[in-house]
Amino acid sequence: MIFDQEDYKAFDPEIWEAVAKEEERQQHNIELIASENVVSKAVMAAQGSILTNKYAEGYPGRRYYGGTDVVDVIESLAIERAKEIFGAKFANVQPHSGSQANCAAYMALIEPGDTVMGMDLSAGGHLTHGASVSFSGQTYNFVSYSVDPETELLDFDAILKQAKEVQPKLIVAGASAYSHIIDFSKFREIADAVGAKLMVDMAHIAGLVAAGLHPSPVPYADITTTTTHKTLRGPRGGLILTNDEDLAKKINSAIFPGIQGGPLEHVIAAKAVAFKEVLDPAFKVYAQQILDNAQAMAQVFRQHDKFRVISDGTENHLFLVDVTKVVENGKVAQNLLDEVNITLNKNSIPYETLSPFKTSGIRIGTAAIAARGFGVTESIKVAELIIKALENAENEAVLNQVRAEVRELTDAFPLYEGLN
């Protein structure tokens, strides 16, 4: 019977081989994509559990199907742990992704066609903060705010002035490529000054917020959204937080039946496990290592005149580097580094002049290497290897040397043993 196929290597060797290749790639690549991380075996085990069989439309105690007593316990644990981590009164753990979480938050806060202010994509914002190719930009009237052209930092006086001109119903704070502390109290003041709601997307910094290493938006935002992977080091998924009971009801309705059907209870179980890991004191040590590694790497680039670190540094898990004095564009840099087994992404920089398919910059994040065990010494070495590869793009002998040094690092810090 099909149900007896426990060994998928024998049943489906094509998929098994592809997964094995990905395991090999992750083991022998240095992962610097800021939105990626490495989950624990416990998180993977929960996500791969028998819960994948269970349908459970609705919420704990209010399901549309029977046989949900157990998943009610699991989802309730996830909710309570999320509330404890972030000091929120209400939490919805059902969003399948951060984009789904943002979509539901918009539905709870505004109406189609309403004016919204969100961070410009090239300044560090996210597609769901009003990009024209996103549902957000197509459903709502988004007006983008940017950063100061000189400092490349948020200019709250300029944002306030723009808000008074635009009169938005909602202001969205948060970013996917902004490397400094965000003052959410300032955004609250601006929102109040123009009678707007405030939503914060803390997807990238949630783990730092949880560890007390970045100010929390929860006391200031009407709704806070996040992903559960990235710096939270959980499974891929979303989370919505609020302290407002009426908004909590609107959020729940927006998720189900609004934009989703049955929740992924196996993923919610994995979220619950990850949340328990976040509540362990060891997580704060991990989060501090993320910061230390990012700042050490950024400093290496700052000391090389051919590279420019955007906004001159970092206060979180990521930073951007303008590479156009060394290679043609960010895409070239990304592809070259892929060849030496260093994985990162091309990224637009503030007031970008190149297309988003090329970009002037690269984005470097340290959440995954910190999870793997890399410290400051290893992080500095990685930064030096990136520079070495980019400055010697046509020198195969040097690139081979970089590959060898990358392999030494990855062999010294294995991901998982006996996984496949």
UniProtKB/Swiss-Prot annotation:
Entry keyword Transferase: yes
Broad class of where this protein is predominantly found: cytoplasm
Protein name as catalogued: Serine hydroxymethyltransferase
Binding residues for (6S)-5,6,7,8-tetrahydrofolate: 121, 125-127, 355-357
PANTHER family xref list: SERINE HYDROXYMETHYLTRANSFERASE, SERINE HYDROXYMETHYLTRANSFERASE 1
Gene Ontology BP, a term: glycine biosynthetic process from serine
Positions marked as site (Plays an important role in substrate specificity): 229
Function: Catalyzes the reversible interconversion of serine and glycine with tetrahydrofolate (THF) serving as the one-carbon carrier. This reaction serves as the major source of one-carbon groups required for the biosynthesis of purines, thymidylate, methionine, and other important biomolecules. Also exhibits THF-independent aldolase activity toward beta-hydroxyamino acids, producing glycine and aldehydes, via a retro-aldol mechanism.
Protein species of origin: Streptococcus gordonii (strain Challis / ATCC 35105 / BCRC 15272 / CH1 / DL1 / V288)
Gene3D superfamilies reported in the protein's UniProt record: Aspartate Aminotransferase, domain 1, Type I PLP-dependent aspartate aminotransferase-like (Major domain)
GO cellular component, as recorded: cytosol
Species classification: Bacteria, Bacillati, Bacillota, Bacilli, Lactobacillales
Cofactor(s) the protein needs: pyridoxal 5'-phosphate
InterPro entries associated with the record: PyrdxlP-dep_Trfase, PyrdxlP-dep_Trfase_major, PyrdxlP-dep_Trfase_small, Ser_HO-MeTrfase, Ser_HO-MeTrfase-like, Ser_HO-MeTrfase_PLP_BS, SHMT-like_dom
Subunit composition and interactions: Homodimer.
Gene name in the database record: glyA
GO molecular function: glycine hydroxymethyltransferase activity; pyridoxal phosphate binding
EC class (word): transferase
UniProt family annotation: Belongs to the SHMT family.
Reaction(s) the record says it catalyses: (6R)-5,10-methylene-5,6,7,8-tetrahydrofolate + glycine + H2O = (6S)-5,6,7,8-tetrahydrofolate + L-serine
Residue positions, PTM N6-(pyridoxal phosphate)lysine: 230
Keywords: Amino-acid biosynthesis, Cytoplasm, One-carbon metabolism, Pyridoxal phosphate, Transferase
Enzyme Commission number(s) of this protein: 2.1.2.1
Pathway per the UniProt entry: One-carbon metabolism; tetrahydrofolate interconversion; Amino-acid biosynthesis; glycine biosynthesis; glycine from L-serine: step 1/1
Subcellular location, record wording: Cytoplasm
